[in-house]
Amino acid sequence: MIVLTLAFCISAVGVYAQKADFSGKWTLDVAKSKLGERNNIETQTLTVTQAANDIKVDTATTRKPPAGGGAPGGGGMGGGGVMGRGGDGPATYMLDGKDVKSEIAGPGGTMVPVTTNAKVDGGKLTLSRSTTFNTPNGAITATSKEIWELSADGKTLTVTTERTSPRGTDTTTKVFIKG
């Protein structure tokens, strides 16, 4: 009987893990999040659409005005968006675990190569990204890794992000509420 119960519990966890669906509209709970010193996010919303082979994330961010006044701006390059993009807007990730190479708009109207990777493992979604761009001081590489986790009831999404750049490593934890 114990073996049967254990087998049922393991299979139930496996079914949940395989069906983890991050779709929905998610609103950042700033009070529950650990955003770090460099983040000036006032509000952030993720609109997520997940299919069998990909996940689409549309990010919208409102920022606090800079210290000393000035306009708050949108996404910018401040590192607040999903995948450390800083910017807002849509992004699509393939869920097959393979690297996808593309280009994004960089400084001064240049195009910057970026490599993304996404996979669902159990009830977690891992999004990785690497960007290398040239500056007058040489090439700079920035990487980020996000781990998305749903609460048991599917109403809370926790996104832990680690970014590495010439500035060092920065880790944030964002808590989003569905609805």
How does the language model describe each region?
Residues 16-179:
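PEST-like low-complexity, intrinsically disordered acidic/proline/serine-rich tracts
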Residues 2-12:
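Bacterial N-terminal signal peptides
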